[in-house]
Amino acid sequence: MWDKKWPIKPEILLNAGNAASNGDDYSDCPDLSLLTTSSDLRNRLLTTTCGTSPATAEASWMAAQLLKEYPDMWPETVRALLIHSASWTPKMLERFKTDDKKSSGKRLLLRTCGYGIPSLEKALWCKNNSVSMVIEGELQPFKKDGSSYKMKEMDLHELPWPSECLMSLGETSVRLRVTLSYFIEPGPGEIGWKDRYRYPSCNLRFDLINNDESVEDFKKRVNIKMRGDDTKDKGDGTSGSDRWYLGTDNRDVGSIHSDFIDSSAIELCNAKHIAVYPVIGWWRERHHLGKYNKKIRYSLIVSIETPETDVDLYTPIVTKIATVIPTN
């Protein structure tokens, strides 16, 4: 049922009441549902609702709050922030992640609960010990080279992490999380359902530099990985997938990808470069449709946080960014 190639659904969970069960079956129960206004105003002003309808309404309200606070934000970023702020409850982990293996327990958790319950406060604001950086970018994934069609662009972003601050934390636990969001153009016709390269116009992926890797080696590895999609050869080197909680097999589906690394602060000191690169889609494979030179927008969110409340990660990051971005 849960074919690993399909997008993650649901993506987030929100409160929508509860159902009553007799052990064999379940049914809606007004006492456990949410109160709302009625469409039949002549007979009753209020009624109850439960299930996906109120959950969708709450998700829409949260998205509206984000746009109210940041009116210039892209839709890709709104979706990314909601998922980036989400987390699983202890009960979700206890029930669904009975097996800690990425291929079974974590996949079951992800396919059942999505990325968890979003936090509007976390989506809206940074804290001293929890900092998120949002990058809105655009790239042209494909190009025509003579009579052939090839991969064209990847983006490399430098992350302004405070090395001295992280080094001073030593073995303190730090979580680095990455979320990449974009929108695809579905493949025309039913042919797209037969091949994963035919339904999406273009897919994107992210990769983080390894601790023992130079920037040049990182760029070469990602470049080979991007071009190697033609032959399914991902090139030399490793993406360090084992350090990610979900791993590439679980997260690299659909058009939004989110994952995190739990590590010591000192091990993340050198995690200062992240790449966004394309993989094959029908824009390139069905070149007779004339879409091979189109561009795709994306939103990339990268955050670091630590449970230590007396740590200030925010100030040195903002200071470093301010020295790079010119002011008018």
What is each of the regions a protein language model found here?
Residues A16-A20, W88, I184-P186:
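Short loop/turn segments at secondary-structure transitions that flank enzyme active sites
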Residues W88-R95, R111, C202-N210:
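Eukaryote-specific, cytoplasm-facing alpha-helical/coiled-coil scaffolding segments in long proteins
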Residues A55-E69:
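Short, small-residue alpha-helix embedded
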Residues M1-T56:
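Catalytic-core environment of secreted peptidases
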Residues P71-F96:
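An often Trp-containing, charged/polar helix-loop segment at the C-terminal end
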Residues I8-P10, V78, V174:
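Residues that flank catalytic or metal-binding motifs in active/ligand-binding sites
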Residues S173-N328:
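Long mid-to-C-terminal assembly/interaction modules of large eukaryotic proteins
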